[in-house]
Swiss-Prot record:
The lineage of its organism: Bacteria, Pseudomonadati, Pseudomonadota, Alphaproteobacteria, Hyphomicrobiales. InterPro entries: Rossmann-like_a/b/a_fold, TilS/TtcA_N, tRNA_Ile_lys_synt, tRNA_Ile_lys_synt_N. This is tRNA(Ile)-lysidine synthase. It comes from Bartonella quintana (strain Toulouse) (Rochalimaea quintana). Its EC number is 6.3.4.19. ATP binds at S26, G27, G28, S29, D30, S31.
């Protein structure tokens, strides 16, 4: 039997400047096929790339430890380095699939850092892609029904003109719709450091299994993959193989559209007059054709999420809420909250800052790194624990007075969202001062949470444009 695998499974760029590659192998057919395909491919290299197989034992089933050991035996037989990493501790009672995914990638990343590897590969297949598309289609259809109903109610209540509301909503919804249906990206960047590549996304699972049979290899079947309690399993069981080619084409088209839209969003941000300083973002009132740009609500939503410390971009329903508020052509100052941000619109433009609710305090122990409020990453290189929280009004006023800052024109609501660090020796608001009263050795970095952990290659165009606005790093 001849098993034809796509000739372009691996790109030349996949292994550029890569001396070590982490392969995530569970023992299932997909990841096992990945192992042998990569192994054979690397034989063609003049300078060999080292394979390190990592098996994540989620410790969710009794069989998982034995399964990890079976992968270890395979690797020993082929003289390949193998590492088992485990999900330790108490497991969540809900959202177990998404939690396991996050933990899995974090464990793979830590091992990559430990091994000095710059690339991780996983065995996601066309089946995974098709299932993801079907799941998102079903969810988006529900969102579309809600969108149409709310649009009708808004027009009935006279919130804004039928033409304006329908036009903006249709364009904006289309933007989010296409983003979701591009599904699993072939390449992403994990923690801004390690490349994550899924080279088998265009290959059917049955093709990979036929490949393994030809090589005389057996694999492990995870019983979880047949459990209808999980949404993905239900979708998998309802999908007919004849639909795969059509859905794969739709995913490809959606991916191309998402890339085009990402570039359009990047161009729009560059065309707008945007500034971010001292906890406040301001977009000067754009000319009318930019306001009518299909990506404008998406851009406003982007800055709202980034200023508010959110970890996810706005879902369709919230984007629709934003659209309805942005289309109110009022000359009066208006203010509303969204995604953890206060958004204020007036004649001069739009201003954003972190709303004061749910900003918690924290402590960073010596040698530790702490993510505060989804906006700041603090590394404590000193020998004392430091406290982190929002800047206090009294501390701000004292700082302004002692440093001859302009108190009269200060925007205290946004200034009070800035990071303040403190200990027994004093306090410091790093973005406002060039010295540290608390005498701590620290590194502070402003992050963009939706893209900091896992950045899809499809979003790179507009993320590159956003980065300079949030390029805040303090090292003392």
């Amino acid at each position: 039997m001849c098993v034809k695998l796509a000739g372009n499974l691996f790109k030349t760029s996949d292994f550029i400047q890569c001396r070590k590659v982490i392969l995530a192998v569970s023992g299932g057919s997909d990841s096992l096929a990945l192992l042998f395909l990569v192994k054979d491919h690397l034989k063609t290299f003049s300078i060999p790339t080292e394979i390190i197989v990592v098996t994540v034992d989620h410790q969710l089933r009794r069989e998982s430890a034995c399964e990890a050991e079976s992968v270890a035996e395979i690797c020993r037989a082929h003289h390949i380095q193998h590492v088992i990493v485990r999900w330790e501790g108490k497991k969540p009672k809900t959202h177990i699939i998404s939690s396991a995914r996050t933990v899995r990638y974090n464990l793979l990343f830590k091992e990559a850092q430990k091994q000095g590897a710059t690339l991780i590969m996983t065995g996601h297949t066309l089946n995974d892609q098709v299932e993801t598309y079907q799941m998102r289609c079903q969810r988006l259809q529900k969102s579309a029904d809600v969108l149409q109903r709310e649009a009708f109610e808004d027009m009935r209540d006279g919130v804004c003109s039928t033409e304006t509301r329908a036009n903006i909503a249709e364009k904006s919804y289309g933007l989010m719709y296409e983003r979701g249906l591009s599904c699993i990206p072939r390449e992403a960047l994990l923690n801004q450091t390690v490349r994550l590549i899924r080279p088998l996304l265009g290959v059917k699972r049955k093709t990979l299994r036929a490949y393994l049979r030809l090589k005389g290899k057996t694999w492990i079947d995870d019983p979880t993959n047949e459990n209808p309690n999980f949404e993905r399993v239900r979708v998998r069981q309802s999908l007919h193989p004849k639909k795969f080619a059509g859905i794969a084409q739709k995913v490809h088209e959606a991916t191309l559209q998402r890339r085009k839209q990402a570039q359009n969003v990047a161009n729009l941000i560059l065309a707008l007059d945007v500034s971010v300083e001292h906890g406040r973002c301001f977009i000067a009132k754009p000319v009318s054709f930019l306001q009518q740009h299909s990506g404008f609500p998406f851009v406003v939503g982007l800055f709202a999420v980034l200023m508010g410390g959110g970890f996810y971009l706005l879902p369709t329903k919230k984007l629709n809420t934003l659209v309805s508020k942005l289309c109110l052509h009022s000359l009066e100052k208006r203010r509303f909250t969204l995604a953890g941000s206060v958004i204020e619109s007036n004649r001069s433009g739009l201003a954003f800052w972190r709303e004061s609710r749910n900003i918690k305090e924290g402590a960073v122990e010596p040698g530790k790194t702490f993510l505060w409020d989804g906006r700041y990453q603090i590394t404590n290189r000193g020998d004392e624990t430091i406290k982190v929280g929002a800047a206090g009004l009294q501390q701000l006023k004292s700082l302004f007075k002692n440093n001859n800052f302009d108190l009269e024109n200060a925007h205290f609501p946004s200034l009070q969202s800035l990071l303040m660090i403190s200990n027994d020796k004093g306090y410091d608001i790093p973005e406002l001062t060039n010295h540290t009263t608390s005498q701590q050795s620290i590194i502070i970095k402003r992050i963009m949470a939706p893209f900091d952990w896992l950045l899809s290659c499809e979003d790179v165009p507009f993320v590159n444009v956003l980065e300079p606005f949030f390029d805040i790093k303090v090292e003392r």
